[in-house]
Amino acid sequence: MAKFSAPVYGASKSLSIKVGETTAVGQITCTLLQSAVSINYNDGFLDMVTGNGTTSVEVTSGYPLQYALNYNEGSTPTYDRRIGYFAVNNGDNTTMTVTFKGSIEGKTQKMTTTVSGIKARDWHIITFMKKVESTGNAGFSIVIDGLVADLELDNNLPASETGDG
């Protein structure tokens, strides 16, 4: 399962209990039992937004969280900054799928990437960034900073840019 702003902490410790005796448990440290995800967009990417969009993050099939990106004519788009918490459902083989769909420079764009090896206590910060190529075309990329993996997925969008690019 996945929820916004709902971290789950826990710990376990093996011990034996004997009848008529006091058992000392000692110190138990609770840790995050989920993987945390936050979504960001850099200013260059937000400047390319021309309509509403959504970033969907899914770790357990059928239980995605939707991070809204809201277009505001004449002002900077706003977006969901909450941290999502995801159950780690498949041990070291747990995979996260990130899908952006929205209006970029007047066209509906969709980009999907996956990150494998998701673990409890990981915090993945996903940042969508504008990318200007040497040819002058603008595009965007997804950069995922986390404790496990840093990945970049590129998608070229035809565009022109003035200035020092």
Residue ranges and their predicted role:
Residues 1, 19, 49-124:
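Tryptophan-paired
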Residues 116-165:
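Hydrophilic extracytoplasmic domains
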